[in-house]
């Protein structure tokens, strides 16, 4: 598009600003993007979708990393002393709603996706991605992670489970609700092609 307008200066158009950002899938590419300096009030993202595809909403997204600390004791003397972090990881994951995992959801249904699990008796780490189109349900998913960690700590002692939840990006529809003309303009332009 930029090349076309540069090659055809006789075609009238409003000011056009173009930016390239990396790391779109996790939203990190925009962390240091100076929106004010960029100068555009609104922007479209051109991505690798199919011809005629127009999307204006997406998941709210967060990552969650849970660390579990166990207590290793010789197996012959472990009764009432050993705390197996790998088993704590299993116990933690069992508190996540079973029907809210990617293999059981579709469309607008949000999910908890366990992407990585590593563990030993002394230490275990679970990594999840949390997704939901609805902001309230997204916040509830983060609360369930927190409550699962708190439950482990209540049972096995403070500091047994720790978590870091990091918001990655939000549903862009929230920002567009007062500017739906942008979607209509894009639809009209696509239909004219």
Located regions from the model:
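Short N-terminal signal/transit or membrane-insertion segments
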Residues: 1-2, 44-65, 139-159
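Acidic/histidine-rich catalytic neighborhood of metal-dependent amide-processing enzymes
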Residues: 1-59, 101, 105, 109-111, ...
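Short acidic/polar alpha-helix capping motifs at helix-coil junctions
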Residues: 14-17, 76-80, 170-178
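Glycine- and acidic-rich phosphate- and metal-coordinating loops
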Residues: 15-21, 67, 162-165
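Active-site-proximal beta-alpha loop/turn segments in soluble metabolic enzymes
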Residues: 24-27, 70-77, 167-172
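Conserved strand-to-helix beginnings and helix N-cap segments that scaffold or border functional pockets
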Residues: 30-31, 79, 139-142
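Phosphate/diphosphate-binding glycine-rich loops and adjacent basic-rich segments that engage nucleotide
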Residues: 35, 40-91
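Metal-dependent amide/peptide-bond hydrolase catalytic core
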Residues: 86-193
